Amino acid sequence: GIGSLINSTEGVLFAEMAVLSDDSTLKSITLSDGTGGNRVIINYSNASNRLTADVRVEAVGQAFMQTYSYTITNFLKIALKYKENDFALWVNGTEVATDTSGSTFSANTLNRLGLDNGASGELLFGKVKQLQVYKTALTDAQLTSLTT
């Protein structure tokens, strides 16, 4: 598995991607333990041009962020930073949402990268140019550079 490449306590999930259609169906990319209960998720949501980011620990929401500001069928550079009390969603060089209250996972919880919701649902039908996982929460300057 890839568990050794993922830090469960902090990190960044980054993707440069576009969905095939804005059809109001859920499409997701996650770091998880194979369930929907422990996950870091970037989600093309069930509303037109809605992009969400969510962190769940033991099925309890720790952070939730969203934006409606982008055309999701265009390629977007998206980064979700997760660290205890420090969550942020970045899109195309801009920090679009933050959450400053929430926990992360115990060490070695996350061990799966999936183009789904963490439990084999909400499959991502899209085009992916880049997919990266960072084991530390990057700085704002690093996230700006990564997503620009």
What are the functions of these language-model segments?
Residues 1, 14-20, 44-45, 75-78, ...:
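Catalytic cores of nucleotide-enabled group-transfer and carboxylate-activating enzymes in metabolic
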Residues 1-10, 65-69, 119:
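Short surface loop/edge beta-strand patches of beta-sandwich-type extracellular domains
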Residues 6-8, 22, 71-73, 106:
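Surface-exposed coil/turn segments at beta-strand junctions on protein surfaces, enriched
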Residues 11-21, 114, 121-148:
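Extracellular, beta-strand-rich glycan-interacting domains
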Residues 24-43, 54-56, 113-114, 146-147:
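Aromatic-rich beta-strand patches that line glycan-recognition/binding surfaces
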Residues 34-42, 57-64, 119-124:
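Short, surface-exposed beta-strand/loop "edge" segments at domain boundaries and coil↔beta transitions
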Residues 43-102:
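Extracellular glycan-interaction surfaces
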Residues 99-127:
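Flexible glycan-contacting loops in extracellular carbohydrate-active proteins
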